[in-house]
Amino acid sequence: MAIQDEMRQVAEGAREASRTLSRMPTEIKDRALKEMAERLLQQAGWLMQENEKDVAFAKNLGLSPAMIDRLTLKESTIRDMADGILEVASLPDPVGKVTSMWRRPNGLLVGRMRIPLGVIGIIYESRPNVTADAAALCLKSGNAVILRGGSEAIHSNIAIGRLLKDVLKETSLPEAAIQVVETTDREAVYELLQLEEYIDLIIPRGGEDLIRAVVRQSRIPVIKHYKGVCHVFVDADADLEMAAKICLNAKIQRPGVCNAMETLLVHREAAPRFLPELARKLRESHVVIRGCEETCALISDAEQATEADWYREYLDLVLSIRVVGGIEEAMDHIARYGSLHTESIVTNDYANAQRFLNEVNSSTVLVNASTRFSDGFQLGLGAEIGISTTKLHAYGPMGLEELTTTKFIVYGNGQVRT
């Protein structure tokens, strides 16, 4: 079958499944989700065997350590996937929820009710866990999903997808509610992006090149999950011990993820007391520092940062550091170089904390906490579909409610328009 026909068949199946799924009772969806979580744990050994094929191929291709880290499935990763699905099952079902009601002067009772978006296409790279997370969120929110992962994770994605579909076959849920595109042919992505009559939304997750290509080619609305140039600003009166703990966690715990800190901004008054000791701790973890002139004067082995470095999402053990004159300069830097993802301020100044929260326009803004908390699971949303940097429809970590929209419902007793 030609790729064009195959993708149309997939999309037609998803559209039909979405109609059935949208009216499924919460109990049936939750029962299926719990069984999916159990199935992942039961088949963890097989999943890791399939994943090893992808990891070996990725190493032969010379993919970066950050890419390989995101690609690798371990027992702990699979357990986290299962926990994420169980968390989704435990959350309230947004479908059918009436968010507000009001009465008009003519007696009409008007309200808003949450409904699924319909069919969602997700295009992603190197992250097999997205297959499980996205499938769970879409199922619970009543959406059919078409999942197209990167060629580097094809064995892992197919394996996870088949386990999830096996559960659907054992329930009254439509089998086409979850579909993994099993071809690595790039033409499949292009063909999916043309099917606006079947697919309601496209969510790309991956590198800049992928996201730009999807936005350029798609005839379907796109919510971008763009790069994470995340900042931490250490204020003049910050608790420096706490600041060091936050910075080390934000940079070192998992440098290859989008909510890792990429640029550190330090108030000029705190820099001499803070940066030399922080640099020593960063050095122990093999972090390369690229700094402004003032940073290089305080850290002897720091490399001179270029203009391009301030825009860069390293996804690696590399950190840009700039010394700034205060909160105004820090916020100006974030506004110029940031990617609207996640920013944190470390401060004991309440006014500065509130100003940072109010004026920094990124999708997640934190006070005295690591950027690593910009995550659906950590914020109580359950597994997330991703972190949107598109302000229209959804902004920040996307959980269940962000995968629904609202329709107007109106109760009357014979009113007619005059």
From Swiss-Prot:
Q: Which domain of life is it from?
A: Bacteria
Q: Which GO terms describe its molecular function?
A: glutamate-5-semialdehyde dehydrogenase activity; NADP binding
Amino-acid biosynthesis among keywords: yes
Q: In which pathway does it act?
A: Amino-acid biosynthesis; L-proline biosynthesis; L-glutamate 5-semialdehyde from L-glutamate: step 2/2
> Record's PROSITE patterns?
PROA
* Major site of localization recorded for this protein: cytoplasm
InterPro entries hit by this protein: Ald_DH/histidinol_DH, Ald_DH_C, Ald_DH_N, Aldehyde_DH_dom, G-glutamylP_reductase_CS, Glu-5-SA_DH, GPR_dom
Keyword terms of this UniProt record:
Amino-acid biosynthesis, Cytoplasm, NADP, Oxidoreductase, Proline biosynthesis
Q: Where is this region: Disordered?
A: 1-22
Places the protein is found: Cytoplasm
What EC designation does it have? 1.2.1.41
Q: Name one GO biological process term.
A: L-proline biosynthetic process
Q: Which HAMAP family match?
A: ProA
This chain belongs to the protein called Gamma-glutamyl phosphate reductase
